[in-house]
């Protein structure tokens, strides 16, 4: 029998359902430098990064948007669950219609220029509605499984990835209680994040959580949940969707992780792209390397990378009666 025909081109199944030409752009080197190397470097500094933020800033709405402009494209469309409000004379970034799938948190870096040139076609629909429309049009992605894995980490095994790419940063060390006593050993600081409870391997009368990563001593500091509460943080690389920082402190609802619950806070713009955020109640896992994003109702106002959590804001005996608000003890 004749040999089987060669497989169709990568995008052929999509091309059958669209009227658009496919154009490719090699950005592998840039992606490695701006996203993968950043991911590794942040873990080496004892921080917990979100690589999607770096990808959106430098790749999707950086290089890719500029490439679209070079092709004289009117817009760059992506599948993010978010909305752009163009009704008020300036562009506002709003949450997606599906609260379970909203992705506005990872888009806070978009300013007026970017929002003028992007489209989020599915942002006004729920995920269920989008799947239904895809089925009606016989699109092959209608039944595609969702994935929360890092796209550059095979099998979602980020631990093995870090051991391969930064073995010098993955060294065992002591687990200390808040008094400085060694109560166990950890497998490498990059494997832990503030607020984490699972996987510590310590038997104790009460549940213990990661309080902080002591990079200088390669030590993991743990303690009871009452030691976790923190009310303030400082963020860097701050972006304001309007393009202008507020001249006075503003009341906001803020998220400190992608799936975190919104929490009431006061946002104060500082100099040189910095901001200080003070929450009404302590949060238990404010983590350097993650983003803090400010909202007013459905509108995204600003966001930045958490740089610093003042030690003076650790919840001590005076705050034991006011429990910290947990955002989850899973790794980011």
Functional labels for PLM-detected ranges:
Residues 15, 52-55, 151-152:
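Functionally engaged cysteine thiol sites
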Residues 16-31:
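Short, small-residue-biased leader/transition segments that mark boundaries at the very start
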Residues 33-90, 163:
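Conserved adenosine/adenylate-binding substructure
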Residues 32-33, 126:
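A short acidic, often aromatic-flanked loop/helix-cap motif at beta-alpha or helix-coil junctions
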Residues 19, 65, 131:
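Short glycine-/small-residue-rich flexible loop motifs, especially phosphate/cofactor-binding loops
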Residues 4-20:
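Short, well-ordered junction/capping motifs at the entry into regular secondary structure
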Residues 77-84, 89-332:
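AMP-forming adenylation/ATP pyrophosphatase catalytic core
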